Every structure is written in structure tokens, then in C-alpha cells.
Amino acid sequence: MVYPILIFTLPLLLGFLMDRVLGDPMRLGHPIVFFGSLIGFGEKHLNNGASRRLKGFLYNGSLVCFTFFLPLLTFAFLLIGAAINYYLGDLYFGHFLLLAIALPSTICIFYMLSGKTLVTEVKGVFSALSVSLEAGRKQVGRIVGRDTGSLSAQEIRTAALETLAENLSDGVVGPMLSWSFFGTPGILTYKMINTQDSMVGYLNERYRAYGFFSAKLDDLVNLIPSRTTAILMLIAAGRLDLLRKTFQHGKRHLSPNSGYPEAALALVLSCRFGGPHDYFGEVVDKPYIGEVGRELSDEDLQRAVQITQRTEWLALGLSLLLRLLLILLIIWYL
């Protein structure tokens, strides 16, 4: 009883710890790069002519289904094999088959989480700004999807902290919650959807039709993670008294999800996010989130990183608890 429970919970803990220590192993190759290649191939060959929305739905929807069902069927085969061997009394081979599920799951979780890399990149923005404004613009351009060539120092710091809050949900909390309920197929599919949205889920002329499905699906799968992230951030900061304001300000964002973690961080730091954003020639006026329009400093970065790292640990604990409850429920039902 204990061994199967450990096999189906420990991968999350180990994968999380590996991410905290090692960060993204880009030199070894990364599944997200492969996801991006598949998405880019479809966009290049299908995002033209008529019926773009339909073509985007069929191609990107197929990628989502493939990403979920291929590992699901593989792990189901291994799990059935383990169950048969346990039934026949061959415990050693049964244990081996469960390990064949757990080890790839651990590696997959490690690759899908981006907590350390996110913090490193945001710190790099503030460090680059201390060198020059141009260096700060170049560095922040690595983590935001808009034109950074005309940003002021304050706008660069704001963009970095906005990204820190938003990607805490997309890159850490969301993947862990997905794994706690749906295992490795869930976390892979979540990141496929998230990558599609980051590549083709824009409202400009080029992507509005083709990326419609990807954008809406990303909105759907992030409804719970984004709000959970905001709540965990407030707990991490010891500011649950800001919960109502966080949800009020979070609703102002043009995205149905991004505003909640951003609002939590802005209110805790007593600063303000939002305002005009230049998306490569197209200016988008985002509603202001937060109450105090002031200059951001290195102290704000330190506080934001502290909240982020505490939130990651809280999300880990929550995800492990949910996973354990799900396993116990399945065992009880069977």
C-alpha cells in the first residue's frame, strides 16, 4: 500500500526540488522547445487563406489530444502490467513497472516547472538596469511578449514584476495542480496549451482567427490556477486581508486570469501595474491594477522574490495533499 502511494506522489516532490536546484536544463534540450516547433510548423503552413479559425482548432486541438493521450495510454499499459504482476505474486516486476512510471514522471515535472529560471530572469532585469537602460530593455525583452525598445526604467521594472506574478501561475502553480489531478499527461497537456497561447494566442490581425481556440482553451485551464496562485501569494505575504481587493482588481485585467496574481503582488507591494503597452506597433491600454503609482526599487524585487518562493512551497504542499487525497479516494473506491 505504501509503495504505490509513494510512487504516485514522490515524483512531484523530487521534480520540484530538482527545479529549485538546477533550473531549466536548456543545454540538454527541452520539451517546450519541441512543443514550440510543432506549434510553429502548423502556424507557418496553416495560418493563411480562408478558414483560419477552423484550421487552428483542428491542428492545435490535435496537438493537445496527442499530448494527453499518448502518455496516458503508455502509463495505463504499464499500470495494468504492474497490477497483473502484483496479482500473480511477482512483486519485483510489479515494482519495476511502477518505477517505469515514476521516473519519467519525475523528469517530466522537472522539465515542466520553471520557478528557478523565472526568478533568475527577473533578477537579471533589475541587474541589467543597474548597468544601463538599454541593457535593461534587452533583458526584459527575454521574458515579455511586447516591444521593449522605448520602455523607461520604471516600465521595465513593472514589466518584470508583472511577468513574475503571471508566470508564477503559468510556470509553477498551474503545472503542479495539473499533475496532482491528471498526472504526467495532465502537466504535459497544460504546458502544450500554455505554449500555444504564448505563440499564437494574440488578438492582432495575424493570430486573431488562427489562435482563437488556443487562447480560449488557455483561458479555461487557467481559471483555477490563477486564482489559487493569488490566494497562495497573499498567504505567503501574510496579507489575506487583501483577498477581496485582489479579486476586485484582478477583474480589471483584459485577461480573465492574469490579473489575479498580478493584483495580489501589486497590492502586497503597494504599487501599480498596467497602463499602455506597445505590442509591436499596436498600443494596448491595460487597466491599472493596484492602488499606488510609485517608483519600484530593488527592495520591491527582493520582497516579490520572497513571496514567489514561499508561494511555490505552499503550492507544492497543496498539490501533494490533493494528490494524496485523490489516490486514497481511488483506493477506497476500488
Mark where each language-model region is.
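RNA/tRNA-interacting regions in translation and RNA-turnover enzymes
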Residues: 198
